[in-house]
């Protein structure tokens, strides 16, 4: 029996999308993206977004649902994902939730209770003008508990926590909880030895360049302005600097590889803390068969 929801998770460059495409074909399933950057239109190469051909062969959802200048809250993502899951469950269609954004996945698998506070552009701009360091220190004063879960450089989550506090008068940490779904969930995680993952990260970064990533960054910067928050995210920030004459292409590649390795380590730590995940070695020649066995055992 196929689980109503199958999660494919893990660090970046572990082959989640590749496995998901094969599983979807075998199971006649749909794919829901759990990637906080693939939701944005035009940010394609740097987010390793499924190609148009892949999206045409297998139905994909929660990709290209926002303009680059828009903000999608975790609550909004959760609501859209839950609605799609309910729709496909009613149609008895298997659903694959695929990605490396741990909070997106947890919002679905654990049914996180999330404050329904709409984005506050003016308030966010005020905090942005004050700078990330100051904003984070302010958050530490009003909600020290949530600061334990937010990196000092994570501007998006810092601003979200601050706006929730200033709109509701209560820390976001006191408004969060869990309400787990009633349907069954199978979580499959992909992992491999660190040296193999390093090699995959290097290969992916070079592939991004070969696919035209420099041109993508240049086009986005000219269209939306170089201070667009998305251009300050992994990969885009390093190549933005190169496009603007700060450093060489080789340095942009090296910095992207380094920062991606660091990011992958944080992702791995997050997912490894979840005891519900069934881990598979992505180098196994029978990876697809192992995954299918887990699914049919549910």
Swiss-Prot record:
Entry coiled-coil feature ranges: none
Top-level taxonomic group: Bacteria
Catalytic activity as recorded in UniProt: adenosine(37) in tRNA + dimethylallyl diphosphate = N(6)-dimethylallyladenosine(37) in tRNA + diphosphate
Cofactor: Mg(2+)
Cross-referenced Pfam families: IPPT (PF01715)
Residues annotated for substrate binding in this entry: 12-17
Region Interaction with substrate tRNA, annotated ranges: 35-38
One GO MF term: tRNA dimethylallyltransferase activity
Site (Interaction with substrate tRNA): 101
EC identifiers of the protein: 2.5.1.75
Residues at which ATP binds: 10-17
A biological process from GO: tRNA modification
Keyword tRNA processing: yes
Alphabetically ordered keywords of this record: ATP-binding, Magnesium, Nucleotide-binding, Transferase, tRNA processing
PANTHER family: TRNA DIMETHYLALLYLTRANSFERASE
Subunit description: Monomer.
Family: Belongs to the IPP transferase family.
Function: Catalyzes the transfer of a dimethylallyl group onto the adenine at position 37 in tRNAs that read codons beginning with uridine, leading to the formation of N6-(dimethylallyl)adenosine (i(6)A).
Protein name per the record: tRNA dimethylallyltransferase
């Amino acid at each position: 029996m196929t689980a109503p929801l199958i999660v494919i998770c893990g660090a970046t460059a572990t082959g989640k999308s590749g496995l998901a495409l094969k599983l979807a074909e075998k199971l006649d399933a749909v794919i829901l993206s759990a990637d906080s950057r693939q939701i944005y239109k035009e940010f394609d190469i740097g987010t390793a977004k499924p190609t148009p051909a892949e999206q045409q062969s297998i139905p994909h959802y929660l990709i290209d649902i926002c303009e680059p200048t828009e903000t999608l809250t975790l609550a909004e993502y959760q609501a859209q994902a839950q609605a799609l899951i309910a729709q496909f469950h009613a149609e008895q269609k298997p659903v694959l939730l695929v990605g490396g954004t741990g909070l997106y996945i947890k919002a679905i698998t654990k049914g996180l209770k999330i404050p329904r506070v709409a984005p506050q552009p003016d308030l966010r701009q005020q905090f942005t003008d004050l700078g990330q360091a100051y904003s984070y220190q302010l958050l530490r004063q009003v909600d020290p508990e949530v600061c334990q879960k937010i990196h000092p450089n994570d501007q998006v989550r810092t601003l979200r926590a601050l706006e929730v506090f200033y709109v509701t008068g209560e820390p976001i940490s006191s408004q969060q909880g869990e309400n787990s779904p009633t349907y069954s969930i199978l979580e499959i995680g992909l992992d491999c030895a660190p040296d193999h993952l390093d090699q995959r990260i290097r290969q992916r970064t070079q592939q991004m360049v070969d696919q035209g990533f420099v041109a993508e960054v240049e086009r986005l910067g000219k269209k939306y302005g170089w201070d667009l928050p998305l251009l300050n995210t992994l990969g885009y920030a390093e190549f933005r600097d190169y496009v603007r004459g700060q450093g060489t292409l080789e340095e942009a590649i090296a910095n992207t590889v380094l920062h991606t390795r660091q990011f992958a380590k944080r992702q791995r730590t997050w997912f490894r803390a979840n005891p519900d995940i069934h881990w598979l070695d992505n180098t196994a020649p029978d990876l697809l068969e192992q995954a299918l066995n887990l699914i049919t055992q549910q």
